[in-house]
Structure formats: C-alpha cells, structure tokens
C-alpha cells in the first residue's frame, strides 16, 4: 500500500454510540462502557461470556473483558518481550489487581502508595459520606457505618483480584507504576486532563481520565454485589437497600459523566482552545474552555441530575471565583450547567443545557 491511515477503535464517543444503537441515554453509554454490546453477568459463573449490562454481576467482565484482557494482551504481544518490569507481576497473577487498584482510586493516581497501602474502597467511603450528608431527610442514613466494612472490602478485593502488601509476591517499585501507566496510555484507555489552579505555587497539574467508563462502573457494581452479601445490610428493608445501592452507583455515574464530557470536549477542541478543570482554594469549575485568540472563556458545572436545583450553579454565581477566572482567562462569555434535563436560561443568566445534546454536537 502506498499509504495507510490508522483508525482508533478503542474509544467509541457518545455521539457514535447513540447513533449506532439508537439510544440517547447517557447512562446506557456509561453502563456499556463504550462497547457496542449489551448483556448480563452472573457473578457465580466465571465462564459465562458477558458484558456488564446487568448490575447484579460484574466479575466476568472485570476478570475477562477488562483487566485480565489487558494482562493477556501484554503477555502475548511479541511473546511478552515488552512486559519488562511487569513480567513478574504478570507471572504472579498480580497485574490485574494492580490495574484495578489504580482504576478504583478516586483520583486515578499512578502512585506507588496506591498499590502498596491496604486497600480501601473509595466508592464505599464516598457513598457513606454522601448518605450521611443527604439534604433530603428521608434519604439520609448512616447505615454504611453499621455494616461489616472489613468483610465487604475483602469480598470486593476477591472480585477485583486485589491483594494487600502482605499477600503480594512481588515487591512493587516505581518502575512498575510507570510501566502500568505507559501501557494503559498505549492501549488508549487513559488520557491526561489539565487541572488549572489559582495557587501561586502550582498553576496546573494533570488529572487522569479513564476513557472506558465501564472500567469504573463495573467496580461500583461489584461493590454493590459485595454489600448485598453482608448480613446486616440484607436485614434492611428493600427500600433502604435500593436507596443505598443506587447512591453508590449514582455517585460513580456522576464522576464518570464529568470524565466523559471533559475528554470528548478535549478531543473536539481546536488548537486555539484549552480545555480542563479549574480549581480554587474552595470549590472548582468542572470544565473550563479558554479561547487563546479571543482571550475569553466559558465555565461549566457538570451534573448527573435530571432536575434543576438552585445550588447547581452556586460557583457560577460566586463573584470572587468569577473575578479570579476573568483575571487569568479573560472575559467569561458563557456560564453553563450541563445536566440531563431540558435546556433553558435562568433569570440569573446561567444557561442550562442538556448534556446528551451537548455531547452529540461535538465533532
């Protein structure tokens, strides 16, 4: 051939997924994880071919379709010659767990401590905190403070193939961490998103986005499954069990929606634009789009909710935050909340835009 064009197939954008499957439901995109196939997983049947459409199961997808497939690909590519420091992890069966740890980490940090410290579920801790602070009294509960967290964590670790340092056969080093990140980048499973700050000591740093949303969602499903095996939790009313389970999944869906919007906006942005998060001493804008030629910017809040709520735009109305933003990134031309409800413009000037329609318009 006189020429060849590389077509990247790992990542399927939301608009393409919606066009091919005829569904505009962003939650379906999150649950399918960017694949074009739906199915269900039986936790008890590790041999059944499946994806992660059913929230009562994820082990098969976690073990076969994500992390173990990554491990298998690394070990078979050119007879494993490119494994380098990961050879010992692969041979001991600990590479899958290492990858799962980084994916589960709230901030997706590629740090040695993430792999060495005793495992704690960030999804569990986040959900427990949110349920304790729930603004609606009828949904406020401290039930996750009263379950057997240790046994739930151990059950989750089994599902994710995660081992604590005492059970690890391989002495992990910074080289292992670096190469795991390097391979995930090569497989187009992660991307770096800039986080701009107003700190005098650090103007920006990188946040890691996982491009396949199912890599996180299936772990949240696994946590729900592990929680449902707890005796104290199972003695609760069906209504309360559903409330807690849905809160765990909703929390993760919200964080993944932010990642999806950020990554797809970054992918469609022009060379004259900068896209990232903007963090302040207190609070942040979920997304900033800066036009270098016009010296102007747009600021966004990204919410998974379908309903309008006044506090969704509180940072977009904060005069101090707006002044700091304008001082660094120029005139603010748009203040917008992306959510799953109908589009409208509020009397305070804040635009509300449907996130699914926003993603469909990106090119």
Regions found by a protein language model. Name each.
Residues 125-172:
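Short acidic, hydrophobic short linear motifs in intrinsically disordered regions
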Residues 8, 190-193:
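A structural signal for short, well-ordered beta-strand segments and their strand-loop junctions
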Residues 170-187, 191:
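Short amphipathic alpha-helical interaction segments
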Residues 185, 193-196, 200-363:
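A cross-kingdom feature that marks ATP-driven nucleic-acid transaction machinery
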Residues 1-141:
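Interdomain motor-coupling "hinge/lid" segment immediately C-terminal to the ATP-binding subdomain
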Residues 5, 165-172, 249, 253:
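Conserved aromatic-histidine-acidic binding/catalytic patches
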């Amino acid at each position: 051939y006189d020429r060849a064009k590389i077509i990247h197939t790992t990542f399927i954008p939301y608009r393409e997924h919606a066009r091919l499957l005829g569904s505009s439901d962003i939650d379906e995109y999150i649950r399918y994880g960017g694949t074009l196939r739906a199915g269900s997983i039986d936790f008890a049947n590790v041999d059944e071919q499946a994806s992660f459409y059913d929230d009562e199961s994820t082990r098969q997808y976690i073990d076969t379709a994500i992390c173990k497939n990554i491990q298998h690909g690394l070990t078979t590519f050119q007879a494993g010659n490119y494994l380098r420091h990961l050879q010992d992890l692969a041979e001991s069966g600990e590479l899958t767990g290492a990858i799962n740890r980084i994916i589960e980490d709230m901030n997706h940090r590629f740090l040695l401590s993430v792999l060495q410290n005793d495992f704690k579920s960030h999804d569990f801790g986040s959900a427990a905190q949110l349920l304790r602070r729930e603004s609606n009294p009828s949904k406020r509960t401290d039930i996750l403070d009263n379950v057997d967290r240790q046994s739930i964590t151990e059950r989750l670790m089994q599902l994710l193939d995660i081992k604590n340092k005492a059970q690890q056969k391989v002495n992990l080093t910074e080289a292992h961490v670096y190469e795991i990140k390097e391979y995930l980048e090569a497989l187009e499973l992660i991307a770096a998103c800039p986080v701009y700050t107003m700190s005098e000591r650090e103007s920006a740093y990188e946040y890691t986005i996982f491009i396949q949303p199912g890599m996180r969602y299936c772990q949240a499903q696994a946590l729900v499954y592990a929680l449902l095996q707890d005796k104290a939790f199972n003695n609760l009313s069906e209504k309360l069990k559903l409330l807690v389970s849905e809160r765990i999944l909703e929390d993760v869906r919200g964080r993944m929606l932010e990642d999806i919007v950020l990554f797809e906006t970054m992918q469609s942005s022009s060379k004259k634009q900068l896209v990232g998060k903007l963090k302040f001493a207190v609070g942040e804008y979920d997304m900033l789009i800066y036009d270098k030629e016009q010296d102007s910017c747009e600021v966004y809040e990204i919410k998974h909710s379908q309903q309008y709520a006044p506090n969704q735009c509180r940072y977009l109305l904060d005069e101090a935050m707006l002044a700091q933003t304008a001082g660094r990134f120029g005139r603010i031309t748009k203040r917008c909340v992306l959510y799953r409800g109908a589009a409208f413009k509020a009397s305070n000037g804040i635009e509300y835009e449907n996130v699914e329609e926003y993603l469909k318009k990106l090119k």
